[in-house]
């Protein structure tokens, strides 16, 4: 790509102030320096400023997280549609957009699953984002409490569904 020791790859990681984000940014910068010889600068700021800058597109590489609001692939995939306000990286792929549009309009679960698989292949090929880690949720639940949802990807707990076992 034309990069070498005299002309290293240079870019900036943009993230909000938080200890975990800083550790991840430092680890990435170190690894990219070691593996690619990249000169990676770190830029951190307070949350409100970070959101404003990120939403205006004032970054080269940004830290962000995605949380599913519902248990369906579109909860993540829709955020990469070129017209989505959640597409802060401004990635655009017309074929991806068309596949997602088609998936949203089909009632056939098998067809929709196949369309999502095709969309995910495009993401894997173009890499508009780099998944770094998944934050695990660890819960300690008193065995006397019943109704606590075990398989709950959104981590929503409605207290009206909880009860004390006798």
Give the location of each predicted region.
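Extracytoplasmic/periplasmic, Sec-exported soluble proteins
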Residues: 16-24, 42, 46, 65, ...
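Conserved C-terminal helix/tail region of periplasmic/extracytoplasmic solute-binding proteins
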Residues: 31-34, 40, 104-105, 110, ...
């Amino acid at each position: 790509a034309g990069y070498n020791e005299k002309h290293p790859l240079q870019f900036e990681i943009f993230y909000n102030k938080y200890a975990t984000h800083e550790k991840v940014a430092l680890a990435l910068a170190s690894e990219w320096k070691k593996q690619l010889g990249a000169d990676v600068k770190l830029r951190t700021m307070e949350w409100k400023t970070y959101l404003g800058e990120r939403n205006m597109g004032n970054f080269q590489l940004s830290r962000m997280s995605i949380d599913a609001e519902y248990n369906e692939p579109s909860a993540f995939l829709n955020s990469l549609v070129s017209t989505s306000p959640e597409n802060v990286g401004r990635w655009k792929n017309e074929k991806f957009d068309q596949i997602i549009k088609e998936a949203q309009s089909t009632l056939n679960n098998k067809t929709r699953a196949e369309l999502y698989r095709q969309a995910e292949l495009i993401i894997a090929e173009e890499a508009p984002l780099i998944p770094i880690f998944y934050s695990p949720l660890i819960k300690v639940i008193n065995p006397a409490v019943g109704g606590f949802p075990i398989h709950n990807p959104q981590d929503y707990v409605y207290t009206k569904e909880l009860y004390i076992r006798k």
